[in-house]
Amino acid sequence: MKFQFFTYLFTLVFLVTLAKANEDEADISFYTGTFDVIDKEGDDQTSLLGIEHKNPDLFRNTFLGKFKPITGGFITGDSSIYLYTGVEGQYGIGPIKILPSFSPGYYEKGDGKDLGSMLEFKSEIKIGFDIFENSKLSYSYSHISNNDWGDTNPGTDNQHITFSKKF
């Protein structure tokens, strides 16, 4: 029941954010990859599929770099779900973009890996290449853990390929 509530809440927030972003332009990313890439036991590694929205209206250029909020989620092949919202930095070297991010979120293990808590933190580094005027192809590596706030803290390392498009 708790999982269903959070899923509906996330969907509602995501759709409202997307509707607001449609007034201008929206940056939507779709990604797929491997969950728990460095699985020592070999029993938790699975595929993942996700979506992420970046709000260009809230983009800020600061002395530390360019930042914007992100909201997204993914589901794994073992029915684990992670829903998150956070901030992403943007640093560019020509057509190459380096995009570090940090996102707290809600994790539901489903039939997959128990990360020890519903509250998990995702840190990610993404390297992207502008392939067309409004499109980007990226490689990401992320780590999700609960910072020892949960019963256990096994953490998980993930990697994925992302396609981003501004609509």
Question: How would you describe each model-predicted region?
Answer:
Residues 20-25, 56-67, 92-98, 134:
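Short loop/turn motifs that connect adjacent beta-strands in outer-membrane beta-barrel proteins
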Residues 46-51, 129, 154-167:
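Outer-membrane beta-barrel "beta-signal"
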Residues 27-38, 64-76, 99-108, 140-145:
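Transmembrane beta-strand segments that form the barrel wall of outer-membrane beta-barrel proteins
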Residues 53-55, 89-91, 129, 143, ...:
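Residue-level signature of outer-membrane beta-barrel architecture
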Residues 78-102:
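Helix-adjacent hinge/juxtasegments
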Residues 1-24:
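Cleavable N-terminal export/targeting peptides
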Residues 37-47, 73-84, 112-118, 148-156:
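Solvent-exposed loop/turn segments connecting transmembrane beta-strands
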Residues 21-57:
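Outer-membrane beta-barrel initiation region
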